[in-house]
Amino acid sequence: MNADTIHYLNLFLGTGTILLQVFCVVTLFILFFNFKKNKKNVFLDFIDKHFLILVFLISLSATIFPLVYSEIIRFVPCYLCWWQRVFMFPLVLIFGVALWDKDRKVIRYVLPLLCAGFLASVYQNFFYYFGENSNLPCDASGVSCYQHVVSVFGGYISIPMMALTVFFSLLTLLAVAHFYKKEI
């Protein structure tokens, strides 16, 4: 891939990451205030109805794009990125089977994977943005967990931030599917 294609891919994914972050904040805000009033909400109804499709598509995207970066563009993932892949990649299959079977109880199966991936991502983001001098574990290949391979929108969007956003968005959708009550 040439540099322009990589640049536009980074911009596309960076914009998608910011939109997903806005979506999560708005969704949690509506869920919290709807939870207090227990009112029917069209936005939350849509999310609740299409929950399995949404989580499947987000997890599929979160699997495809890291593979594009590592296998096509040839960015070598760091140690913590590998751990996040361990927790993200199986979710595509689990959410795919849940979508096929229309199994909304998938929450209990994926919650441990999502929480572990989210914690690994929070850990990586903390040291990526705030702890340049820490002893963050990096693999023997010399790939640094601090390497700024993708840095879009003034350095705010990076690969670790993309991963954190994906885990957070999946947890947000799980929260809506679990806590949103449709009764008026």
What is each stretch, according to the model?
Residues 84:
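Cys/His-rich metal-chelating microdomains
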